Amino acid sequence: MTIRLHRGDLPDLSRYRGDAVAIDTETMGLDPIRDRLCVVQVSPGDGSADVVQIPAGASAAPNLTKLLADGTVLKIFHFARFDLAVLFKAFGVMPEPIYCTKIASRLARTYTDKHGLKDLVREVLGQELSKQQQSSDWGAPELSEAQVAYAAADVVHLHALKQRLDVMLAREGREQLAQTCFRFLPDRVRLDLAGFAGEDIFAHS
């Protein structure tokens, strides 16, 4: 796996001229309102990844935000709801269009309740994914080799997962339902950031 480490932004978008990009984020915690964005990792789907450290207080990353805002490029996430929130909060850009492998897994793999990335990669792709660095200091000025490798590993499998999950969704007749869910995600994220994360506003009571 080829990993390129950057600070502040992608140097250019020459590697991202395809129709889909895999994206993940690392933050100081799991509250998108409280915890700042520290790292954005992206992969063009060729087995390589760019890991971008985001300085504290940064609100601009021109090349990265251009990619996020490009409506012709599909953004593949795992648990997009969280990543969209932290990216929107940091840069003011809501990435679209979106594909979420976690939502796709929940719709296609109803025989299991294991929809985490590690479980998904193991079953669907037959590979092991280490999660040892999941809870670590992503705001550190210098990331360890283990952190960088962990961040990259979280995105290099997403293109392949999408392909396999698409087959399962089609087999179960849930392709259109998945697409509807993906299109709704930006609005779900705006509700989260407006303070409605723990409330089902569609419920009767």
Q: Whereabouts are the PLM-identified features?
A:
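DEDD superfamily 3′-5′ metal-dependent exonuclease/proofreading module
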Residues: 1-205
